[in-house]
Amino acid sequence: MTSNRGRPPGEVLVDTSALYALLCSTDDCHAAARDAAEALLAHDSALVTSSYVVAETAALLQSRLGRDAARGFLLDLVPYLDVAWVDEGLHARGLEAWLAQRREGVSLVDCVSFALGHELRLEHAFTFDRRFVEQGFVVIP
């Protein structure tokens, strides 16, 4: 896969941190998330995520912003995402990576996302979590 540095990529892995920032107008990263999402959509970038990220984002929205925010996400935004449903194999690869982690802060959902992104050979991740850089992704924004 060739590098797309300098322009939005064709496919990008999407993380909970980006989705939450996009949907929460009071989040410190909201403006950056909105601008990045607009650029990605303007270039018809495929927004790829896992079913675990969908569940994590819905739970986070519900706990912080209420059920209506989670409902809006699930009904209005998720249909525009390319959701990879986590199967037993992807879960096992993510779990193995998570168990190998020695530090706090890296979640099972993160490790499943890393595994999914590597499996699909995605170079870019729409995220505010810098651990994606450590995993070899070019982060957006």
Feature locations, PLM:
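Acidic, PIN/NYN-like endoribonuclease modules and their adjacent C-terminal/linker elements
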Residues: 1-9, 54, 114, 119-141
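Short, well-structured N-terminal submotif of metal-dependent ribonuclease cores
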Residues: 1-48, 62-72
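Histidine- and aromatic-rich ligand-binding microenvironments
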Residues: 9-15, 49-50, 106-107, 129, ...
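Short active-site oxyanion
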Residues: 42-47, 80-82, 121-123
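Active-site neighborhoods of divalent-metal-dependent phosphate/nucleic-acid chemistry enzymes
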Residues: 83-124
